[in-house]
């Protein structure tokens, strides 16, 4: 059983292993064999190891049929061993074992990428900022990465399209369960002309814990993350902190002291994020460079 097949199988049986444990397995045994000692090492439990081996062996014969069905739906499967796997994402501590992709695959390897995240309830100022920054960023040929959520995320994708730029949407569930439904038309357009990504099989319904998992992919794909509006406990700050852990730059758009949605960016600036007033501030902080990283495998 090759590495890619094992990763795909594990994802399809609902990820019995977390990304970090799957990486541990791959490091312990590059062949990813199903021997009991190896499985017990990564699951830390004899019963769990036996259950995992049983599920993999039951599902593995079905894998070719499942992958064929995905291809018919226009869905590409990209295991971490693939050359198509995004360079930047592969460098983080816990990259997804497999990416499911729908759209223009060339966007994974071409163009510098910047993430934009923020509140689901932007003010008129927030909308103006997104349109202004996105237009400037796209003019430089950068690719906008966001989470297809309501508010700032969806607006970032739409503004990229309007500016004739390119954009990547990272969703929390599978392609059969786009959330929120209000962005379904936007998602359909992106799947045809840009690209959508998920670490979950297409039939996976989004769960609460999938959203912070999704956020690490947004930041992992990007050289930096811009936070446009968000309260102090906003989910967009989770993305910002994950970006910092991944060694990415964090940018924050200042707002009014009397606006609760300025609380998140102000907090980030106090903690060392770079306050930005234009896209030029981003370009100055992220000059052309050759990034070195160590492969996780």
UniProtKB/Swiss-Prot annotation:
User: What's any GO biological process attached to this entry?
Assistant: establishment of competence for transformation
Q: What subcellular compartments does it reside in?
A: Cytoplasm
Per the annotation, which location comes first and is thus the protein's main one? cytoplasm
This protein's GO CC annotations: cytoplasm
By its UniProt entry, which InterPro entries does this protein fall under? DprA
Q: What happens when the gene is disrupted?
A: Transformation efficiency drops 50- to 100-fold.
Q: How would you summarize the oligomeric state and partners of this protein?
A: Interacts with RecA. Interacts with ComFA and ComFC.
The UniProt similarity line reads:
Belongs to the DprA/Smf family.
The molecule here is called: DNA processing protein DprA
Q: Which organism is it from?
A: Bacillus subtilis (strain 168)
Originating gene: dprA
């Amino acid at each position: 059983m090759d590495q890619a097949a094992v990763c795909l199988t594990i994802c399809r049986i609902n990820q019995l292993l977390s990304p970090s444990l799957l990486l541990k397995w791959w490091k312990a045994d590059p062949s990813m064999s199903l021997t009991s000692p190896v499985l017990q090492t990564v699951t830390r439990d004899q019963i769990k190891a036996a259950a995992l081996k049983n599920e993999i062996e039951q599902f593995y014969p079905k894998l070719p049929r499942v992958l064929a069905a995905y291809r018919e739906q226009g869905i590409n499967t990209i295991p971490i061993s693939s050359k198509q796997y995004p360079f930047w994402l592969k460098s983080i501590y816990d990259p997804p074992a497999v990416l499911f992709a729908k759209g223009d695959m060339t966007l994974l390897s071409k163009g510098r990428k910047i993430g934009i995240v923020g509140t689901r309830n932007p003010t008129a100022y927030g909308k103006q900022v997104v349109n202004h920054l996105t237009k400037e960023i796209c003019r430089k040929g950068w690719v906008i990465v966001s989470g297809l959520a309501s508010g700032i995320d969806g607006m970032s994708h739409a503004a990229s399209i309007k500016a004739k730029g390119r954009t990547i949407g990272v969703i929390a569930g599978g392609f059969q369960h786009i959330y929120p439904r209000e962005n379904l038309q936007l998602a359909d357009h992106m799947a045809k002309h840009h690209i959508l990504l998920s670490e979950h099989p297409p039939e996976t319904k989004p769960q609460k814990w999938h959203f912070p998992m999704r956020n690490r992919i947004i930041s992992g794909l990007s050289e930096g993350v811009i936070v446009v509006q968000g309260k102090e406990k906003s989910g967009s700050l989770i993305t910002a902190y994950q970006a910092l852990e991944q060694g990415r730059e964090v940018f924050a758009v200042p707002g009014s002291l009397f606006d609760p949605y300025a609380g998140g960016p102000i907090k980030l600036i106090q903690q060392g994020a770079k306050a930005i007033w234009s896209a030029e501030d981003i370009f100055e902080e992220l000059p052309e460079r050759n990034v070195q990283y160590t492969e996780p495998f």
